[in-house]
């Protein structure tokens, strides 16, 4: 977690930089995160009693459900994993079991903690890596092996003295060369020189085929046990100094990190600040008034998810992980089903319900221009590499937004994702001709938008296939 936790208002402001509208959803996740901080300040007895209030987001596709959860996890440095509810199967059937979401969360947490620890020791690791690079670029003299014959031992006194002096001179030359190379490395003059480095060979896992209920974890455990018994193979690779430094820095950093301590911290972080985002939860809801064998299977998955959301202990290769204080955010479009179609026990575990609104024309205009990673900024940057300054007039932006809105209304509503298809269609010819275009500035006008998209957008049959 951050040293200075963000207030709910600050969290919403940060989210506004990337996501347009959806204030209710932003507030809900901001409060959930702030409550985690509040809980951490309580005494231990009360802290254990307070569980996170899980959130259920409802709204059409492409309005920002997943993006809100993903950005929130980045803001606070929390372990975050996004899973699809439809990927899981009931216990006893072939497929992923629901406990794998917790194992994925712990793996993410371990990766986060490991990165942080590596950044802490990066300076020392780089220093050690540079020393190793110097030794690789200027190897030491080879030590002479093999016993001397008896005559040499008796009569070769002067020769020994001469050899000793020659070796001293050679050592001094090597040391001077190493100082010179170290200086050149520091100045970055040797970045493109090649050097041969020994690196650990990545062996393909024989347990990749072990998938399904329980087998996945068993395969990982057996693989870990065998890898600790078998010596790690190394292979020689020819790399540039720049690439070799990265490899050696990682190796040196790994030596400086206590992995047992890192794993312990990662498990604790997953338990206390982990976020699991369950997408497409409406797809495992039983359809109203319908009944089939598929519905029975869906209900089975819900019943398997239930104990994890309620709070249970899951075994992972890093130890037992409790899910009591993991924050679960579920999301679904709920076109065909309603939240009430979920089993009652699961409904009760998502007390905070947030409905995300459909995007209006004004929302589309904001999405195109306002966020830090706005689509128009991306296209401008791409064409800038070809020496073209791409500009959009305000009326053209409005026209693009209107086309996106109307196509969503007339066909399937896919939210902001519609803008991707429309902009690709609009700029297709320009992107193709860009390397040969001599104009330095290209301005997109409403007339150009109408010319490229107008006829397609108005024809419902065409827009279904093209936009």
Swiss-Prot record:
The gene designation is: clpY
Basic and acidic residues composition-biased segments = 165-174
Name the residues that bind ATP.
20, 62-67, 279, 345, 417
Q: Region annotation Disordered: residue ranges?
A: 147-174
Primary site of residence: cytoplasm
Could you tell me what this protein does? Answer: ATPase subunit of a proteasome-like degradation complex; this subunit has chaperone activity.
**What is the protein name stated in its UniProt record?**
ATP-dependent protease ATPase subunit ClpY
Quote the Gene3D superfamilies the UniProt record gives.
Answer: 1.10.8.60, P-loop containing nucleotide triphosphate hydrolases
One GO BP annotation is: protein unfolding
**HAMAP family with a match to the protein in the record:** HslU (MF_00249)
Under the heading SUPFAM superfamilies, the entry gives:
P-loop containing nucleoside triphosphate hydrolases
Subcellular location per the Swiss-Prot or TrEMBL entry: Cytoplasm
Molecular-function annotations in GO: ATP binding; ATP hydrolysis activity; peptidase activity; proteasome-activating activity
Q: Which family does it belong to?
A: Belongs to the ClpX chaperone family. HslU subfamily.
PANTHER family in UniProt? ATP-DEPENDENT CLP PROTEASE ATP-BINDING SUBUNIT CLPX-LIKE, MITOCHONDRIAL-RELATED (PTHR48102), ATP-DEPENDENT PROTEASE ATPASE SUBUNIT HSLU (PTHR48102:SF3)
Question: Which terms in the GO cellular component ontology are assigned?
Answer: HslUV protease complex
Q: Read off the lineage from the record.
A: Bacteria, Bacillati, Bacillota, Bacilli, Bacillales
Would you say which domain of life the source belongs to?
Bacteria
Q: Which InterPro entries match?
A: AAA+_ATPase, ATP-dep_Clp_protease_ClpX, ATPase_AAA_core, Clp_ATPase_C, HslU, P-loop_NTPase
């Amino acid at each position: 977690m951050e040293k200075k936790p963000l207030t709910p208002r600050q969290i919403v402001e940060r989210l506004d930089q990337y996501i347009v509208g959806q204030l209710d959803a932003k507030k809900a996740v901001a409060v959930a995160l702030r409550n985690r901080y509040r809980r951490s300040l309580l005494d231990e007895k009360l802290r254990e009693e307070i569980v996170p209030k899980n959130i259920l987001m409802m709204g059409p596709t492409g309005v920002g459900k997943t993006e809100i959860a993903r950005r929130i996890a980045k803001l606070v440095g929390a372990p975050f994993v996004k899973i699809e509810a439809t990927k899981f199967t009931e216990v006893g059937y072939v497929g992923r079991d629901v406990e794998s979401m917790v194992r994925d969360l712990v793996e993410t947490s371990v990766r986060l903690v490991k990165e942080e620890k590596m950044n802490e020791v990066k300076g020392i690791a780089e220093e050690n890596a540079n020393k190793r690079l110097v030794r690789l670029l200027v190897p030491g003299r080879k030590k002479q092996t093999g016993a001397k014959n008896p005559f040499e031992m008796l009569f070769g006194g002067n020769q020994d003295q001469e050899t000793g002096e020659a070796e001293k001179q050679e050592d001094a030359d090597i040391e001077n060369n190493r100082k010179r190379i170290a200086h050149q490395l520091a100045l970055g003059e040797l970045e493109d020189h090649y050097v041969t480095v020994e690196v650990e060979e990545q062996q393909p896992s024989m347990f990749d085929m072990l998938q399904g209920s329980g087998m996945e974890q068993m395969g990982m455990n057996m693989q870990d046990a065998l890898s600790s018994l078998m010596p790690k193979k190394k292979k020689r690779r020819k790399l540039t100094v720049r690439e070799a430094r990265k490899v050696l820095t990682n190796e040196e950093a790994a030596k400086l990190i206590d992995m047992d301590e890192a794993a312990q911290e990662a498990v604790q972080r997953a338990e206390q600040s982990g976020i699991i985002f369950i997408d497409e939860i409406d797809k495992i809801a039983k359809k109203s008034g319908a009944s089939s064998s598929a519905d029975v299977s869906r209900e089975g998955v819900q019943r398997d998810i239930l104990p994890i959301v309620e709070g249970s202990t899951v075994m992972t290769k890093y130890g037992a992980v409790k899910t009591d204080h993991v924050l679960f955010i579920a999301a679904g479009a709920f076109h065909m089903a309603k939240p009430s179609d979920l089993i009652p026990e699961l409904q009760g575990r998502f007390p905070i319900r947030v409905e995300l609104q459909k995007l209006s024309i004004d929302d589309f205009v904001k999405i195109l221009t306002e966020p830090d990673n706005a689509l128009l900024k991306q296209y401008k940057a791409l064409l800038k590499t070809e020496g073209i300054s791409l500009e959009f007039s305000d009326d053209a932006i409005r026209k693009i937004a209107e086309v996106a809105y109307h196509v969503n209304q007339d066909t399937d509503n896919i939210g902001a994702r519609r803008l991707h298809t429309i902009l690709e269609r609009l700029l297709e010819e320009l992107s193709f001709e860009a390397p040969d275009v001599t104009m330095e500035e290209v301005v997109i006008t409403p007339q150009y938008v109408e010319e490229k998209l107008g006829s397609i957008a108005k024809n419902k049959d065409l827009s279904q296939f093209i936009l």
